[in-house]
């Protein structure tokens, strides 16, 4: 048969299948914009700012609606009430991990972030327990972060108050904290092995936030055969996994079951002690990759955005430094006990996380069983997008949400004020495993920097652009330079 005829017949079959799937599902699922055959609602969504497009849809269809990403229906939850009801009140039903094809290729259903069912429960339980035992929120992890904060300050001193782009240095610090927890070892900032690891992690986050990846994730079977940056991401992921496997082999040679040094040792001991199919070398490598992905780039991007916002608002930076001077002084390192006596600094860090909205649409969830949600029927396995933007930028909880204002987290007396709407780490059973670690890092790194340096912009604060350059998977700040002036 003529290849052209085969192609036309194939496209016709695909078109009919798409129309049938859309029509069969739309009566039961929440309402939403009318999808085109095959491509769904992709042309109606801005790949550079997905969250903005979802907000527009919510104005038409309410807090629960359906969009088609390609041929696949995805239910979107918009606003605090809908997000909380799903992730917290119905946590078990909404605890599945939704589909991200490019990352599924990397994880193969293993690890912490992109696994499901028993694998996810076992990995999450083990990771939380191990991180707690090594001091998640306790003293030993704090010691490691304080050590890295001192190294960070020394690296910043080496800039000699000259203009610099802080991206690399601010990436090294949280990466080294993860290395300390996982490998029992930190790296010099000029170590070639470390630099290559950093480069691979940085590039993959940029790729994940690109419009091309949003398109790829909707048509993976087709685009696998075409060149593109998805190939670069997979190549980087292979490098990271090979790097981790080499470290695992080194640990196997030196393993002392009575004296575990780090996360890898604990995992290897678990493998020896239990005949558990969830604990294999491959799942160890993926779990460590997940910890790197979650614990390095997210924190470094937040730090980078933090300094940009403090440059934009020098009066805020000055007030934080006054509080540091009053509570900590100049002659000792900041510690976590200081945070309770520094309400303004605590409010500033919370406001930074709220304002930058690092993961606008969260990682996708999926329902683990058929669910009736607000009178709509959502079949088992349906992907769920929870708009964290709609929660963090809620006008009732945070008046003038588009304005950077630490007062969003302060009461009338200047005391720190908690908010249920503060969900930068998501909520419920899939809440970020490394939340405690990230909170400690943000506080200790930022206070250490501001204790030792005045931040100086190269342009007038009013001329600084703080608009995220990409709002896809991660909100990425624009590039900038500054001077670290020793105090």
UniProtKB/Swiss-Prot annotation:
The UniProt entry lists the main location of this chain as endoplasmic reticulum
Any idea which GO molecular function terms this record carries? heme binding; iron ion binding; oxidoreductase activity, acting on paired donors, with incorporation or reduction of molecular oxygen, reduced flavin or flavoprotein as one donor, and incorporation of one atom of oxygen
Q: Where does heme bind?
A: 432
The protein's annotated catalytic reaction(s) are: an organic molecule + reduced [NADPH--hemoprotein reductase] + O2 = an alcohol + oxidized [NADPH--hemoprotein reductase] + H2O + H(+)
- EC assignment: the record states 1.14.14.1
Names of required cofactors: heme
Supply the InterPro entries for this chain.
Answer: Cyt_P450 (IPR001128), Cyt_P450_CS (IPR017972), Cyt_P450_E_grp-I (IPR002401), Cyt_P450_sf (IPR036396), Cytochrome_P450_fam2 (IPR050182)
Keyword annotations from UniProtKB, A to Z: Endoplasmic reticulum, Heme, Iron, Membrane, Metal-binding, Microsome, Monooxygenase, Oxidoreductase
Gene Ontology cellular component annotations, sorted alphabetically: endoplasmic reticulum membrane
By its UniProt entry, which CDD domains does this protein fall under?
CYP2C-like (cd20665)
Q: Which residues form a coiled coil?
A: none
Task: Identify which top EC class this enzyme belongs to.
Answer: oxidoreductase
What induces or represses this gene?
P450 can be induced to high levels in liver and other tissues by various foreign compounds, including drugs, pesticides, and carcinogens.
Cellular location of this protein?
Answer: Endoplasmic reticulum membrane; Microsome membrane
Indicate whether Nucleotide-binding appears among the record's keywords: no
* UniProt record, GO biological process: organic acid metabolic process; xenobiotic metabolic process
| Note, other | This protein differs from other forms of cytochrome P450 in that it catalyzes the 21-hydroxylation of progesterone, resulting in the formation of deoxycorticosterone.
Family named by the database record: Belongs to the cytochrome P450 family.
Q: What does this protein do?
A: Cytochromes P450 are a group of heme-thiolate monooxygenases. In liver microsomes, this enzyme is involved in an NADPH-dependent electron transport pathway. It oxidizes a variety of structurally unrelated compounds, including steroids, fatty acids, and xenobiotics.
Q: Tell me the PANTHER family matching this sequence.
A: CYTOCHROME P450 2C9, CYTOCHROME P450 508A4-RELATED
Stated name of the protein: Cytochrome P450 2C5
Q: Which gene encodes it?
A: CYP2C5
